Amino acid sequence: MYCVKDVVRSGGYTFNIGVFRLDLSVPQAYVNEVEAGYVLPENWDRGINAFYTSYYASQYYSDYKNSGSSESTYVRFNSGFNLLGWQAHADTTFNKTDGSSGEWKSNTLYLERGIAELLGTLRAGDQYTSSEIFDSVRFTGVRLFRDMQMLPNSKQNFTPLVQGIAQTNALVTIEQNGFVVYQKEVPPGPFSIADLQLAGGGADLDVTVREADGSINTWLVPYASVPNMLQPGVSKYDFSAGRSHIEGADNQADFTQISYQYGLNNLLTLYGGTMLSNHYNAFTLGTGWNTRIGAISLDATRAHSKQDNGDVFDGQSYQIAYNKYLTQTLTRFGLAAYRYSSQDYRTFNDHVWANNKITIVAIRMMYTILLIIIKTILGVKYVFS
């Protein structure tokens, strides 16, 4: 028979022979807790069979003196149905102007189904790829991706783990900007608090552990976030395959796009992806950092494009983002140098357009866009670019 201390580090037990009661003590870090408000996948309900639709309609008419009149009609429908656990979604528009009979267009039309075992969604039809790592592409095909809404609320966005060791039965208090945002009693031993629900990219966290003997330990946990950062242990995948469906392009292209993100620890998130097509490929690697001086993300993309006329373009694109909340002045500071790209860098959309012999306006000339955002607690927002 195993002793609790042999199986669980810092665990223990007491046995009261008078009442034949055995009390076990297991550190909070080793307890598999379900976040309040979260429903386990095996208890999910796919909903009832139903149809829905919503619409927006506008009618414009103008009468000009000595120059006739003009009239236009615009209608947009968002419709779909839920049947046997599958959902269909359609986004369609109707546009009619003077001298035309009107035209119906479908922006998206796809069938999807949630896959609880993968915490993801399978989607097939006319849709768009993710824009988190590569530029979004409209296409016809299939997409399988991690649906973050299937995760507990605290894991859908980046929040740090708060970890420590309690010497006795202790009270852990976490404050942000002077407000208590979390409080929990923990037994002796290691603890790990992962179910924080905080304002995105907010201020650093002040942690206080009050022991049963009255002693107090305090420390600071840095907290700032930028896009693509994930909580430690959380991963995000996205797979798309199909044929581009770019409006106005006669020559489309088959492609496959894969991306993956993983929260390694409180400090580091890793992410990357690839886009593969006939005569085109692109690869991205990036990191997100949560540090005492703020959150920083850096990524680099290398792309190769060979056009139908034989022209070859090899280029690079770099992206940096920064975010920091200054508690002393109650000011949020954000800096983004978005997409510095070399002259020969081509996105997949550029590649398709070039093969349609359509001139790309301002085609990927070397550029840097610098955006600085400063927002104070008074709601005053300053933007410099």
What kind of region is each of these model predictions?
Residues 269-274:
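Short catalytic-loop micro-motif centered on adjacent basic/acidic residues
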Residues 232-260:
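Compositionally biased low-complexity segments at domain edges in trafficked proteins
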Residues 2-233, 288-290, 299-366:
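Outer-membrane beta-barrel channel domains
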Residues 75-79, 254-260, 287, 382-384:
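Structured alpha-helical segments in the cores of large, soluble enzyme domains
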Residues 348, 362-385:
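Exposed, low-structure sequence patches enriched in small/polar residues
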